Amino acid sequence: MADAITVLTAIGITVLMLLMVISGTAMIVKELNPNDIFTMQSLKFNRAVTIFKYIGLFIYIPGTIILYATYIKSLLMKS
């Protein structure tokens, strides 16, 4: 059972990390000058970037805390 929990934890951390990277990239793209990039040329792309920006804003701090807590827990389990 411990192996299943470890695998699910690793999958969860990976998904959270990927979502944080995508959302962070969306925040960077959103903050750039719209005249210099292609963001405003596509309404669907702009909408997707906006959605990922809000997801990034809402999960950045809790996600970082969860990743840190999981890392500390794994260090304590090894000891």
Curated annotation (Swiss-Prot):
Stored Pfam families: Pox_I5
Induction or repression: Expressed in the intermediate phase of the viral replicative cycle.
Membrane topology (Intravirion): 1-3, 69-79
Keywords assigned: Late protein, Membrane, Transmembrane, Transmembrane helix, Viral envelope protein, Virion
Protein localization: Virion membrane
Virion surface compartment spans: 25-47
Annotated InterPro entries: Poxvirus_I5
Transmembrane domains' residue ranges: 4-24, 48-68
Membrane topology note: Multi-pass membrane protein
Major localization class: virion
Gene Ontology CC annotations of this record: membrane; viral envelope; virion membrane
Family: Belongs to the orthopoxvirus OPG081 family.
Task of the protein: Envelope protein.
Protein name per the record: Protein OPG081
Organism: Variola virus (isolate Human/India/Ind3/1967)
